[in-house]
């Protein structure tokens, strides 16, 4: 494995599992604890922008305060150097949730029964309500 596929000498990036406007998400192996994790890494083209660096850091801190069964847990954060530019690139290590997204299910044309749709919706609403209450509480403290 190349040095670029390792973060902090601990996390081995395996495959890209998602892309967003600000970051890429990788399936990785935590060799210290012997478990698979998700690593969200700020896109290298945004790493030189202090605003994006700060936003990414705030996201990590906010997410780390949350402890809910419907929200991926944050395990660690860190920084790696972009080999091309030498710039620091932050990353967040999170719980890996295996499975399919709702988008995948719908794209495959599978039907979701109303009861199952209600379960999905209730899970999302529970997580949103919890995170909203936690973030309001911590910003008032």
Task: Identify what each model region corresponds to.
Residues 13-20, 25:
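Protein kinase glycine-rich loop
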Residues 120-121:
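Activation segment signature within eukaryotic-like protein kinase domains
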Residues 124-136:
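Protein kinase catalytic-loop region centered on the HRD/HxD motif
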Residues 137-141:
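Conserved small/polar residues in nucleotide/adenosyl-binding loops
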């Amino acid at each position: 494995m190349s040095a670029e596929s390792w973060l902090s000498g601990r996390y081995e990036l395996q495959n890209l599992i998602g892309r967003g406007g600000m970051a890429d998400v990788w399936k990785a192996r935590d060799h210290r604890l012997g478990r698979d994790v998700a690593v969200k890494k700020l896109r290298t083209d945004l790493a030189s922008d202090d605003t994006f660096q700060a936003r990414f850091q705030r996201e990590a801190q906010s997410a780390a305060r949350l402890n809910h069964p419907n929200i991926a847990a944050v395990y660690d954060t860190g920084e790696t150097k972009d080999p091309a530019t030498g710039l620091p690139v932050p990353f967040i290590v999170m719980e890996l949730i295996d499975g399919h997204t709702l988008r995948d299910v719908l794209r495959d044309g599978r039907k979701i029964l109303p009861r199952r749709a209600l379960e999905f919706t209730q899970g999302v609403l529970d997580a949103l309500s919890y995170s909203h209450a936690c973030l309001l509480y911590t910003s008032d403290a």
